[in-house]
A protein has these predicted regions:
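Single conserved hydrophobic/aromatic residue that forms the stacking wall/gate
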Residues: 1-9
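Exposed, low-structure sequence patches enriched in small/polar residues
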Residues: 8-324
Length: 324
């Protein structure tokens, strides 16, 4: 079976599937220039249209278009701009978390850029940003990402990715009353969501056979609700008297260290250490460093693994046995 085109999930599916029961059609146009001109080595342009539906029943969910223009300069700098525009309302059949319900989604536009310097430089900073706007409910989205990279020498390099995201007046599912005998009531909320992600990647190559890699990541999300609504059968929202505190803060910290040693052709030993912390609270802390300190004092899990892969050349073994 095919989950993309089915209302049911398949036990034989592999990979990551956000939603099943989807049916999408797309139309794409490309315009590419591969020969250098002016200050540019190459120039690529994309225009794509998407028409989305449920597979069963065949219901309209959304129409959108995406554009991107990217170029590489003669200095080997990379520049890209893009936009994603949803010009007409649609419906989300998954966010209500209950079969037979839908949420009406509204017009929205998102614009972004990216700049990457020449990666041959020992020090550089990747920069990207996005701004999204939706008139209904005053929805806004701001995104900024910085990625400094340092190559100290041929053995040691370091990369730090800092990602900021602020979603203002975002709509989403909060709760529902699933008690028997009561009419189903689904509550949505208008919220402000803040995300900060810090990721540090380092790599040290001792020899052509021995290497050490370290990845440290901290993810922090804060959600504060401003208003609550009751979802209607037609997908619209009506003001609700719901007044529970649904604000929360989530912290996820991960550390992954990998030591690898290729001790023979086709043979390798790998030692891995993983450290993980997960902390969720309804208490909001606005100071990043104070929040990080609390996270590091939370309970954590450590795991260690050792893997040895040995390549045995049976042809050579049998050849030696015959000769003896």
């Amino acid at each position: 079976c095919d989950s993309d085109r089915s209302s049911d999930l398949c036990s034989s599916d592999l990979g990551f599937l956000r939603n099943n029961n989807e049916f999408s059609s797309s139309l794409a146009f490309d315009y590419d220039v591969y020969e250098s001109f002016g200050n540019f080595l190459s120039w690529h342009n994309d225009l794509q249209f998407y028409y989305n539906q449920l597979y069963e029943p065949r219901s309209f969910t959304g129409f959108s278009m995406w554009t991107r223009s990217r170029a590489t300069t003669k200095n080997h700098n990379f520049i890209s701009i893009d936009s994603w525009i949803k010009p007409v309302p649609g419906y989300d059949f998954f966010e209500p978390r209950n079969e037979g319900w839908k949420q009406k989604t509204y017009e929205y536009a998102d614009y972004g850029f990216r700049f990457s310097p020449d990666y041959r430089n020992p020090f550089l900073v990747d920069v990207s940003g996005q701004f999204g706007y939706g008139k209904k409910y005053g929805r806004r989205n701001y995104h900024l990402e910085l990625g400094p990279r340092i190559r100290f020498n041929d053995h040691f390099n370091m990369q730090h990715e800092i990602e900021f995201n602020y979603a203002e007046n975002e709509l989403g599912y909060v709760t529902d009353n699933d008690k028997e005998g009561d009419e189903l009531k689904i509550t949505f909320g208008k919220r402000d969501r803040r995300n900060i992600t810090n990721t540090l990647n380092t790599s040290y190559i001792f020899t052509n056979k021995i290497a050490l890699d370290l990845r440290v990541r901290h993810y922090w999300m804060q959600v504060e609700y401003n208003d609550f609504y009751t979802l209607q059968k037609d997908g619209t929202l009506e003001p609700s008297g719901y007044d529970e505190n649904e604000d929360f803060s989530t912290n996820i910290f991960n550390l992954d260290m990998t030591y690898s040693w290729r001790f023979a052709p086709g043979s390798e030993m790998t030692f891995v250490w993983k450290n993980a912390i997960y902390k969720e609270s309804d208490e909001s802390v606005s100071d990043y460093f104070r929040n990080f300190e609390r996270t590091m004092s939370s309970p954590y899990n450590n795991s260690f693994s050792l893997k040895i892969l040995y390549y045995l050349d049976y042809e050579q073994v049998f050849k030696n046995q015959k000769s003896s």
